[in-house]
């Protein structure tokens, strides 16, 4: 028998190999991962590269990684180009103020590009678009309903109802007409027609048509056309000039001044006639359209009458207030009660007359005061006795006169003797 083959070593999986590599990296870089030095970081990169890629050239490895990145970027660019080519442009939706966004179908959802899902503020119900279609004023919606309403969808009750309507007496009396309902026209002219408009002539049972005939033009559209046809002022002037003809007078400065003078005179005459007419109306008692100024122009004597009437004004006062004020007794002063009597002046000090006299502050200049202080004479030195008495009565008091002989040589000798003979107290 041939010898048995040695059992093959079990092939290790990719995960186990990766774990082994990570363990080797941790052992070799123990305590160096948190180091911020450039050398330590470079050493860690080299260890990781050797363990993961073996003894490969680091340039080739970096080049391979760069190629992988460029391939990924190229794929993304291709996808973006395809989306730009085949994706239709969708403009941002705008909703009028006060409108509910849920009543508008999302434009991105219709193109299959909305990625918001339930968070989208617009509606994802495509049936809303059919419900929100504008009603055409040239099509009666009841005609479409009648076309769709066929016998295939009827039951017995519906069939009986249709027969009665079609061949009943009321249907026979009711005339067939192509006349447009007047309420329908008024609603369109006044911009009141819409989904919730109901015909006042019977609603859906109205016998008249709720559709405009082909070629019908509304009044508001006619007004717009008329406004567009209006010509400018320059064209109107040229048109009128062309219609005058050749037999007309040319405008010069003299003819223009004559025309202006004639017009002004006509205006003055017209104003005078109107004033006379107003005056006649005022005399007749018709003062409805006459102003206050015209009243005084027609009757100037009213101005003086108004001044005279202003003096004869009667003022109304309340008698009760005057009575309440004079309710207390008022007594007059009787001078006969005051009698002169002699008073005993013993023990009473009487003030001198000079005390009751008022001293008037003189407003002399400082130079005059200096002259008086230095012994100079006053200008009004020689005053009469009558003038001095008048000054005293009026409250003017002059300076006290100085006695020049008050301190003579004899008096000074007597004072010196008294000083020597004076006993000094110790």
From Swiss-Prot:
GO terms for cellular component: cytoplasm; nucleus. Signal peptide: none annotated. Belongs to the ZC3H15/TMA46 family. Interacts with drg1. It is found in: Cytoplasm; Nucleus. Residues 378-392 have a biased composition (Acidic residues). PANTHER family: ZINC FINGER CCCH DOMAIN-CONTAINING PROTEIN 15, ZINC FINGER-CONTAINING PROTEIN P48ZNF. Residues 219-283 form a coiled coil. GO terms for molecular function: zinc ion binding. Residues 1-28, 374-394 are annotated as: Disordered. It comes from Xenopus tropicalis. Gene3D superfamilies: 6.20.400.10, Zinc finger, CCCH-type. It holds the Pfam family DFRP_C. This is Zinc finger CCCH domain-containing protein 15. Residues 14-28 have a biased composition (Basic and acidic residues). Protects drg1 from proteolytic degradation.
């Amino acid at each position: 028998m041939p010898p048995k083959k040695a059992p093959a070593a079990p092939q290790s999986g990719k995960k186990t190999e990766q774990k082994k590599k990570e363990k080797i990296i941790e052992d070799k870089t123990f305590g160096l991962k948190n180091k911020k030095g450039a050398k330590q970081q470079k050493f860690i990169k080299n260890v990781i590269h050797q363990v993961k890629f073996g003894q490969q050239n680091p340039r080739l490895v970096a080049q391979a990684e760069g190629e992988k990145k460029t391939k990924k970027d190229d794929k993304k660019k291709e996808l973006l180009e395809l989306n730009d080519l085949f994706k239709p442009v969708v403009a941002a939706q705008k909703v009028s103020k006060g409108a509910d966004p849920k009543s508008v179908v999302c434009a991105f959802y219709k193109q299959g590009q909305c990625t918001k899902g339930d968070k989208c503020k617009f509606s994802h119900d495509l049936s809303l678009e059919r419900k929100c279609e504008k009603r055409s004023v040239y099509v009666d919606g009841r005609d479409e309903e009648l076309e769709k309403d066929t016998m295939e969808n009827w039951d017995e009750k519906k069939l009986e109802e249709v027969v009665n309507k079609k061949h009943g007496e009321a249907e026979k009396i009711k005339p067939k007409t192509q006349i447009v309902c007047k309420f329908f026209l008024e609603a369109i002219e006044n911009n009141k027609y819409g989904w919730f408009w109901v015909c006042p002539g019977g609603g859906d049972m109205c016998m008249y048509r709720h559709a405009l005939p082909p070629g019908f033009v509304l009044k508001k559209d006619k007004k717009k056309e008329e406004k567009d046809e209006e010509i400018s002022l320059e064209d109107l002037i040229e048109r009128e000039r062309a219609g005058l003809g050749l037999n007309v007078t040319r405008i010069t400065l003299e003819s223009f001044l004559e025309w202006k003078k004639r017009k002004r005179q006509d205006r003055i005459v017209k104003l005078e006639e109107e004033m006379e007419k107003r005056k006649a109306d005022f005399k007749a008692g018709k003062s409805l359209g006459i102003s206050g100024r015209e009243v005084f122009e027609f009757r100037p004597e009213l101005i003086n009458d108004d001044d005279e009437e202003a003096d004869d004004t009667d003022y109304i006062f309340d008698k009760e207030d005057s009575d309440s004020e004079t309710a207390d007794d008022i007594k007059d002063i009787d001078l006969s009660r005051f009698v002169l009597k002699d008073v005993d002046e013993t023990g009473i000090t009487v003030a001198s007359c000079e005390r009751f006299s008022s001293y008037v502050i003189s407003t002399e200049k400082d130079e005059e005061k200096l002259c008086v202080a230095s012994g100079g004479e006053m200008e009004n030195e020689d005053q009469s006795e009558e003038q001095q008495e008048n000054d005293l009565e009026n409250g003017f008091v002059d300076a006290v006169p100085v006695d020049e002989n008050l301190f003579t040589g004899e008096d000074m000798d007597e004072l010196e003797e008294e000083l020597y003979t004076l006993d000094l107290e110790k």
